[in-house]
């Protein structure tokens, strides 16, 4: 379980987050949605301590994030970004092996898991394992990025606008794939997007952000049927009902 308690982040005169309170249950697929600059990416960067709050605390399984060993915390967290961060001079298999090698897996364990996961995302290792990132399409590169994030069997998967640069077909395929893998591996997934359709499709619950504050946290159907504010209603194309 991940819990934000009265979390704030302030840069000089700008409040990036203000008094954020949010509880994310183990195994939940939580989507953070809102316009650019609303604080979505800041929230997930705080989980693996790329950013530190100026006020409040974030807890993982009842323990403050800042009390975890930083290296162990990051090795237990998968991260998938919009900018596909594969090392260009390493093959697909070598890119995927980086985290397992840090965890001292054997070569046999790495090879077996790499083959298994690449098959799940439709990239057979015999055909794709030896390729460089430059030899892959954008959608294929992001599939490799997902495998690399998942191979270490993280408890938490952070996904920051991972599909926004892809074509519509690749995006739809990867949305389905991500949800399937989330369920199969039982991870807690925190997914950032500005796309409300994507949020509705993927989320167990949605947290709607505006100007560094959470306006509503609810299941997709509740967001649509009972938006808490005019902002939430407008964002999702509806209206507030009394």
Give the residues covered by each predicted segment:
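Helix-to-loop junction immediately C-terminal to a conserved catalytic motif
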Residues: 48
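Short helical segment in ABC ATPase nucleotide-binding domains corresponding to the A-loop/adjacent helical element
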Residues: 93-101, 111, 115
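Conserved ABC ATPase "signature" region
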Residues: 108-127, 180
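Conserved signature/switch motifs of ABC ATPase nucleotide-binding domains
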Residues: 134, 152
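Catalytic Walker B motif of ABC-type/P-loop ATPase nucleotide-binding domains
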Residues: 157-160
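ABC ATPase "signature
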Residues: 217-218, 226
């Amino acid at each position: 379980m991940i819990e934000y308690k009265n979390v704030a982040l302030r840069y000089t005169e700008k409040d990036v987050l203000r008094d954020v309170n949010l509880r994310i249950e183990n195994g939940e697929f939580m989507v953070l949605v809102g316009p650019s600059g609303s604080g979505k990416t800041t929230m997930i960067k705080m989980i693996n301590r790329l950013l530190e709050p100026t006020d409040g605390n974030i807890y993982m399984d009842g323990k403050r994030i800042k009390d975890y060993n930083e290296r162990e915390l990051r090795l237990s967290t998968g991260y998938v970004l919009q900018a596909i961060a594969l090392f260009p001079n390493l093959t697909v298999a070598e890119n995927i092996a980086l985290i397992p090698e840090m965890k001292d897996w054997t070569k046999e364990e790495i090879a077996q898991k790499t083959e298994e996961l690449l098959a799940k995302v439709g990239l057979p290792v015999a055909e794709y394992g030896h390729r460089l990132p430059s030899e892959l399409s954008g959608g294929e590169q992001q599939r490799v990025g997902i495998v690399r994030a998942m191979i270490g069997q993280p408890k938490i998967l952070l996904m920051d606008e991972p599909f926004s640069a892809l074509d519509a077909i690749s995006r739809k395929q990867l949305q389905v794939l991500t949800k399937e893998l989330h369920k199969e591996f039982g991870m807690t997934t925190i997914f950032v997007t500005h796309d409300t359709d994507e949020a509705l499709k993927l989320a167990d619950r949605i947290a709607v952000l505006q100007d560094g504050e959470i306006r509503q946290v609810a299941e997709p159907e509740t967001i649509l049927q009972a938006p808490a504010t005019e902002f939430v209603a407008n964002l999702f194309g509806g209206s507030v009902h009394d």
